[in-house]
Amino acid sequence: MFPHKKNDPLKSLPISRVGSSQRLNQHISSIPSTPNYVASSLNPVRNLPVSSGSIKSKITTKAALDKFEQLPIVKQVGAFEDTLNAISDNISQFKEGQLHANVEKIIAINDDLKSKIEELDRHRRLGENIKELEAESSNLDNTSKYILKELISYRNELRALPRLPASASKGSGDTVEIEDILKYAMKLAKFTKAPATSASMPFQIHPNNYVWPAEDALRRGMLAASSLNPDEIIANELGTTEEEKIQEKKDEQVKKADKQQDTGIRRGSFGDYGSSSSGKKKEEQSAQLDLDLFDSEDEFSD
């Protein structure tokens, strides 16, 4: 058996506002506590803003943590905490000598932190811009990859199409003058016609309705013009020059003159037996040929 405990009249007992039975039946989760939206000095962690970055921190390794602690603003925050703890110790221990120095130190750290917080805000905005640019860059990368994939698929489809057989004999590459081509085309144009398929094409003008003469008319005209000067055509085909033609004409004229002289000499040697009769015949022929069908005096005779 436990010994009986005597009541101490000098000891005060806690007074509860809730009955004992109600306290025993109360669930642990229903204990009243400070709400999340109310700032509490007893729980300063609740004063921090809750965001996706704080819930899932990017610091996952010891090296990342050391790098984070080496930042200047983090060092100043640590110094601010240490100074604040020193001030609280001075107040609790009534050390007035160090209190004034610690207060001045914490004020200087606070002013420096204000300027750094403004820079931190600027860096935060820059970080948001960097994230937007990274997202845009990733979208552009995805779009470029999609375009490249489509181009590769189109290239494969084009390569799968049948190809024309490669010509075994390629052109020698010799250049041909335009004048030679035009001359050859003019020669072919005299003896060629339009293909038969062009006659059945819609809105096709018949060759007979052209402004210029048809091919048959051109050929007939060329044949008629060539029949008037056969000697020149033969000379052109044989390749004789103009000097040779002139020389041949001179030779022919000389031969004709020699023949006329020979005939006159021969007639004079045999005598002028038939001169009177030939003169009469010439006069009769000239009289018969000199027919003046238009007489100007007949108009005024009436």
Curated annotation (Swiss-Prot):
GO terms, biological process: regulation of transcription by RNA polymerase II
Localization annotation: Nucleus
Annotated InterPro entries: Mediator_Med4
Record function comment: Component of the Mediator complex, a coactivator involved in the regulated transcription of nearly all RNA polymerase II-dependent genes. Mediator functions as a bridge to convey information from gene-specific regulatory proteins to the basal RNA polymerase II transcription machinery. Mediator is recruited to promoters by direct interactions with regulatory proteins and serves as a scaffold for the assembly of a functional preinitiation complex with RNA polymerase II and the general transcription factors.
Family classification: Belongs to the Mediator complex subunit 4 family.
Top-level division of the source organism's lineage: Eukaryota
Subunit and partners: Component of the Mediator complex.
Recorded coiled-coil stretches: 98-145
UniProt-annotated stretches for the region Disordered: 239-302
Compositional bias (Basic and acidic residues): 242-265
Acidic residues composition-biased segments: 292-302
Taxonomic lineage of the native organism: Eukaryota, Fungi, Dikarya, Ascomycota, Saccharomycotina
Listed name of the protein: Mediator of RNA polymerase II transcription subunit 4
GO cellular component: core mediator complex; mediator complex
Keywords: Activator, Coiled coil, Nucleus, Transcription, Transcription regulation
Amino acid composition bias (Low complexity), ranges on this chain: 268-278
Keyword Coiled coil on entry: yes
